[in-house]
Amino acid sequence: MKKQILRAVFLSFSLLFIGLANIAAQEGDSKAVAGGGVMVKGWTGKIDAKEQTAGLTLNSAKLSQDGKALHVTTGPATTYWNPKNVAKGDYTVSATFLEPKYMSLNDHPHPYGIVIGGSDLGTDQESYLYCAAYGNGTYIVRGFGPKPFQMGGRAPAKDDAVAKAAGVGQPVTQLIAVTVKGDKVSCSINNKVVATFDKSAVVAAGKLKSTDGVYGIRFAHNTDATVTGLKVTKAK
């Protein structure tokens, strides 16, 4: 009987180890970008705390300007913003994200998207919400307050509105927008609302301090894409 119990315990730990190993393999290590740093006037950024723990810095990712486009290459997962870009009241923040070569820096999809409600950015008390799309037809709505939190679940959600790349190395474009209007906060991708939340569920302990705040962009690790048309407009 004792041998059977020991076998069961051993099997359970073995399966747990394999599961954790698979998760680690899926997440992968962030690869520092050569010649990195923030090269767009007025902009700054912050990498995730776990990336800092791994010894990476803001210079391990790169934000540059190609004509009218912001060009981001990561590196560690990074959030970028210009402190002058502030949205208040009812508004929509939107931009177009182009991943010219899907999964060019990784072996699985990684997301990028819009940040809103930024407060105390760049500090250990920062808070913000972001809606981000993957080039495989899924999206997430998450944030920091200052610890990470998820809206609508941990796993990426599928929606037909989210564009899918034709294959690895192929281009994929996403128009992403976050709207604050009245008591609702919503995320739209390619002109379709894919998620809506009560503002009271977003502005809460451990989440946003307010939906008023700095807006910007966020990229997961090991991703390369451009951003055009980043703007704030009055919510309709």
Per-range role (PLM):
Residues 95, 228-232:
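Extracellular beta-strand elements of beta-rich domains used
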Residues 197-228:
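Flexible glycan-contacting loops in extracellular carbohydrate-active proteins
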